Amino acid sequence: APLTQHVSKEQRFRCHSQTSRQDPLISNWIHRIDTQYMPSEAQRDVLVLLPCSARKPYSRSQSHRFFRSAIRNRSVHQVIVTSPLGLVPRELEEQWPAAHYDIPVTGDWDSDEIDTIQRMVSNLVNRVGYKRVINHSGIEFDLDVETIDTRAEGVGASSKSACQTLQIAIDDAVEQFNLENIREKELLKHQFSALSMWQFGTDEWLQDLHVGGKPPRWLLLDGKQQMAQWHPDSGRFSFTKSLLPKLHSTGTLPVVEIGGDAPWKGDIFSGMIVSAPIDLKVGQEILVVRNDTLIGSARSLAAGWEWQGGVGRLAKSQHRL
């Protein structure tokens, strides 16, 4: 599995050859989307498939601004069709490597790319149970659900006529399936839950929280108290000290045990480690315990295998309780 969970916004993953498709980072993404990923329950009726863009995240591109103006209901689930990742759900577009890969956008697909995308879409549709698929990607699909193609052959996806056709198809689906246009912060809560499931395998820690603040760094609040903040540039949540006990009790973050009797000061070094998960990733948030007591949090600077008998600094401290 990939050894890094988060990277700086400047980092790029270059996909300029077919061999890049074999990279563990790519195969891990495809496997998870293909077999595990589920959208929020609020977005499981209508799926719209959109083409990718050279600019990442996609929503910052001109073409996707056109698409989003045509998709006027937030209950419609947007998924971007791309290579080599196959599919990128809108709520995951700020994740590594979806926000960082660099590939020439030619509009031409080889048979392997098409086969991968068609398989992934079919698996996603069958697993989620969408009632209708609106296909604006330009790729043909043979699905066991009603599919509406909104791009005429040879017509650009972001052209005025194509976007009008897309908007008509969306509006028709909204009316036919009586889709409620959920509020922005309600949608954000659903999307943060999906992001939490993707990153941590659970969203229990945020179930009682609500979204506040202003874009792009939204806050997750308990009443008026900030518990977490979303950082879109790095695709991560930052947690406040007061949330650590809940993150621990819900099993959200991996746990590292350190030894010694002196007060914990500074960062975490190899000589301090009693135990650590073997699958830790660079950039991953971890909880720190001593003698079965939670004492703080840190951010991993090394992959899990380096924690087993390695040397040097392994994690940067974040909070102390």
Tell what function each PLM region has.
Residues 175-252:
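Anionic-ligand-binding alpha/beta catalytic cores of soluble enzymes and soluble regulatory domains
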Residues 99-133, 178-205:
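Extended, charge-rich low-complexity interaction segments
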Residues 227-321:
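Beta-strand/loop-dominated core regions that host nucleotide or nucleotide-derived cofactor-binding catalytic loops
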Residues 58-70, 106-123, 162-169:
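Well-ordered, non-membrane alpha-helical segments in soluble/globular domains
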Residues 54-59, 85-89, 104-115, 139-143:
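Short acidic, S/G/P-rich loop/turn micro-motifs used as interaction or catalytic elements
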Residues 139-185:
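Peripheral docking tails and interdomain loops at the edges
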Residues 76-100:
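Short connector loops at secondary-structure junctions
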Residues 2-68:
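Active-site and ligand/interface coordination hotspots across diverse enzymes
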